[in-house]
Amino acid sequence: MRSHLVKGADRIELTIRSYTDRTGRTPKKKVLLQMHRYIEKDDKWTNKDIPCKSEAEALMKMREVNQYWIAFHGYTVEES
């Protein structure tokens, strides 16, 4: 699932990723909420991975992040 927020040329992309971590003895399902943010004045992308326990938790965090950026920073949801 993805979410795109925009404010002028600045943008935030949120993506929920799930994968199986096979590095240990037993495979474990991992879920991440990935935030990619582009700032025009710096002309660079920043990335942040937020670990979650489940896809439902990742979806709740995605909604919280969306509400924060919309309410406090004036971003709007990009229509696809």
Which residues does each PLM region occupy?
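A short, charged, amphipathic alpha-helix used as a generic interaction element across diverse proteins
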Residues: 44, 52-73
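Short glycine-enriched loop/turn motifs at secondary-structure junctions
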Residues: 40-46
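Short N-terminal "domain-start" leader segments
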Residues: 1-35, 39, 76
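Short, mixed-charge low-complexity intrinsically disordered segments
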Residues: 9-16, 47, 67-80
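Generic detection of short hydrophobic beta-strand segments and adjacent strand-loop junctions
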Residues: 4-6, 48-52
